[in-house]
């Protein structure tokens, strides 16, 4: 199975891989959401983090990926959705995000008021993986609507409509950076509903993997130099000698 092959390559525990296969067999994807299952641009590299995240998701936990810039938080979230063969629902949080954006709002359809389902509602309904990007940028009153969704109740109560229970395969993966403009500490009540994974900084080994995957024809000397430059920038940013702005793998 292509989606799980790279787990075997990284020597992820065979028991975890077996349980992922069982999860995939148990929860089939409905045709209308199949287009949301997208192969990531690159596999996530890091056996320990993968095992921790997969074990948490199999136990029904929601994940909160924290850590400095350029540690692969979004790549990991996308990989997990792909590994579990679940449709991915991305929500990019910002200061103006409100509960209507997440759960849904009223709209007119054929002269009738109906609910336009939000991203979180659809994720809950179809058993997707909700990727909550930069969750610490939203106001607390906006994300508070997620409390019942993320804890043992696993439900969404839509005012004026009905209560829906989450699909048993639905999971939520939040990502957050510290120190970005507009970010803040998350409410303790919200954090307690996640399994928090602190993402480690890039290493020479992980950067070697990324460069070999993304640029297979690059000259070895050039690859070594690029890796060295990034590690130097990362060290200086960690020691607050420079800003974190130049520390980026996207460019």
Can you say where each PLM-predicted feature lies in the sequence?
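Conserved core positions of repeat-based scaffolds
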Residues: 228-236
